[in-house]
């Protein structure tokens, strides 16, 4: 059975490739989406790739993923550090989440060191640029395989 992964991207990620390439790299969000689609095909995953600058959209999509028993690979961007709403949506939806960041948030400004999402994520990948998305998909594929082998669903952290 093919598992669906919602790949959710938060604010300002639509500007990738133009916005601070020294921090976030030169890959655009379209480049990352194309790489994710290729990787997902090899991993026998289906992806639903989305981006919004609005917190409520991310909350609604997390809830939708929960209703569809899908996984979530999320780069909440700045909302990582501020959004209790996204934290609560993940907890309420009981969805398996991998959090990803292009930069190493722990090597940046102090206000970026804490993520509200990390506490409810299965795992966190940061600092590997666009490759982090592919690492996240591989992690979710491994979780899907484990669930299939065990005949159960592994939810949350």
UniProtKB/Swiss-Prot annotation:
Residues noted as binding substrate in the record, renumbered to the chain? 75, 81, 88, 102-103, 112
Pathway listed for it is: Metabolic intermediate biosynthesis; chorismate biosynthesis; chorismate from D-erythrose 4-phosphate and phosphoenolpyruvate: step 3/7
Please cite one Gene Ontology biological process associated with this protein: quinate catabolic process
Q: What is its EC number?
A: 4.2.1.10
Q: InterPro entries, per this entry?
A: DHquinase_II, DHquinase_II_CS, DHquinase_II_sf
According to its UniProt record, which residues of this chain constitute the active site? 24 (proton acceptor), 101 (proton donor)
Q: Does the keyword Amino-acid biosynthesis apply?
A: yes
Q: What Gene3D superfamilies does its record include?
A: Dehydroquinase, class II (3.40.50.9100)
GO MF entries: 3-dehydroquinate dehydratase activity
* Taxonomic superkingdom: Bacteria
Site positions for Transition state stabilizer: 19
**What catalytic activity does the UniProt entry give for this protein?**
3-dehydroquinate = 3-dehydroshikimate + H2O
What the entry lists under Pfam families is as follows: DHquinase_II (PF01220)
Does the keyword section mention Lyase? yes
Q: Could you tell me the keywords of this UniProt record?
A: Amino-acid biosynthesis, Aromatic amino acid biosynthesis, Lyase
Subunit details: Homododecamer.
Record family assignment: Belongs to the type-II 3-dehydroquinase family.
NCBIfam families to which the protein is assigned, alphabetical: aroQ (TIGR01088), PRK05395.1-2 (NF003805), PRK05395.1-3 (NF003806), PRK05395.1-4 (NF003807)
- Role description: Catalyzes a trans-dehydration via an enolate intermediate.
This chain's protein is named: 3-dehydroquinate dehydratase
Organism, as annotated: Brucella canis (strain ATCC 23365 / NCTC 10854 / RM-666)
